[in-house]
A protein has these predicted regions:
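Mature catalytic domains of secreted/periplasmic carbohydrate-active enzymes
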Residues: 1-136
Length: 136
């Protein structure tokens, strides 16, 4: 399938939901919390990350009930925290939290179960990389 066809298919899907959610939700200051709050121990917040899997499934249910055809979820934002099992590439992921589960797997499995298309947002910028601000 050509890129143009994929774009047209995406546009035909219509109404979608974009969920910005991750470690930064702990601070209730949005996805740029580390920069806004200058939280010195932001990276340690993952020791408190323990979402309710039922809530993740409820996002899909609510989206489906309200006519959304797809959902985009942040798999990794600029803070570098991964909502998926990095398989040893990083310990800054949901598997190394009290939650000890792959949020993305739960989300994608539930989307498939309910017949709604899952999409993922993955930020290549990472605050932990010293070159992070070089291109800004």
């Amino acid at each position: 399938m050509m890129v143009e066809d994929k774009i047209l298919n995406f546009e035909k899907m219509g109404l979608g939901l974009f969920i910005h959610w991750g470690l930064y939700a702990h601070f209730a200051e949005g996805e740029w919390a580390q920069n806004i709050l200058e939280v010195p121990n932001y990276s340690q917040a993952f020791t408190h990350f323990n979402p309710d899997p039922k809530k993740i499934r409820q996002w899909v249910t609510l989206a489906k009930q309200n006519g959304f055809k797809y959902i985009v979820l942040t798999a990794k934002h600029h803070d570098g925290f991964c909502l998926f099992d990095t398989k040893g590439i990083s310990e800054f992921d949901s598997m190394h939290t009290p939650f000890k589960a792959d949020v993305i797997k739960i989300f994608v499995d539930e989307c498939h179960r309910q017949g709604i298309a899952p999409f993922l947002y993955f930020a290549t910028y990472d605050w932990h990389n010293p070159k992070y601000t070089a291109d800004l």
